[in-house]
Amino acid sequence: MKKNEKFDLKLILIWPIIASVITIFLEEKNIFYQNFFVSIILFLALPAIYLSFRAKQYVLKTLIVSTLGSIPIMIVVEYLGQISGAWSFPVSIFSFKLFGFVILEVLFWAFFNMYYIIIFYEYFLDHHITKHLWEPRMKYLFWGLLIGFVSFLFIIFNFTIPVIPYFYFFFGIIVFAIPVILQFTIYSHAKKVLVKILKASAYFFYLSFIYEIVALHYGWWGFPSENYIGWVNILGVRFPFEELVWWIMLFALAVLSSYEFFDDNEK
């Protein structure tokens, strides 16, 4: 690892703590009211933008993959999650909601979360520069997402969507668990890739855990339902077991597993 990369890694490693300290200071001193949107900037956007300046060669590809892979899926997931009461966002700075349910902050959250994961992975671990921005496999992801999203629009405009019991549990299996299981079984021979994915995921476990604790403490989001398979009580906050497994533990693993399959080289 180069000297500048070592410095950047040290900065990125302590950034979740810096973001938390800034949040606590601003909240306790009543200097500035924090909200979900501001938290996205602090915990995700700022470090992602910083790495973008340090790793310009990966930015365009990461932008394309993150936009394609986050926005359509998040709209569908958020719509169904809100209907089913899987989670809630008490405050939004935007009065407009997509399709009456989807706040715009979740789209920023999904995009910057995915973007940060991929740019971190490329800059610190993968170092894979390609001459083209679109791998052949990406067309399958593109068409799959397009067909899925158009089908979603057709359904919500023509039918009443029912409440889905234990929605968080079932959607997590499809979106997070399956990509990770496939990556670690079908591509078990690609040990170097698996190690890199695990290293990146370890950092995002640490980041997401801190982010979760701070977010729940200040009420940036919550979990109003009882349709969860269990609860985690820690450091004065309470969140579903699904949140621990799907987002905190497996989100980065799922993103990078899908990224390696569709738009990287599995090497």
Regions found by a protein language model. Name each.
Residues 1-267:
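Aromatic-rich, lipid-facing transmembrane alpha helices and their immediate juxtamembrane interface loops
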